[in-house]
Amino acid sequence: MTIEELEKVPFHFVAHMSMEDMHTTTYESDDGRFGFCDHVPFKNGEPHGRTFRHYRIGLKVYKSKAKFIEALKDV
């Protein structure tokens, strides 16, 4: 699969978890094959630090976009 093909896959909101030190929002493709989570660190009630994203194919989680893109070639 290519990035262009992935961009055509519809995603929907699944969950949002708000903790004192981190907010996490999770999205999943309509067919359940792909997902991603956006993580926002918080400190004293305000966003603090760098936001990051984890990617998922099936049950395998990728912490870098480069590794995720490499794994897409096998899908």
At which residue positions do the language-model features occur?
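Amphipathic alpha-helical segments
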Residues: 1-12
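Acidic, low-complexity, intrinsically disordered interaction modules
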Residues: 12-66
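A short, charged, amphipathic alpha-helix used as a generic interaction element across diverse proteins
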Residues: 64-75
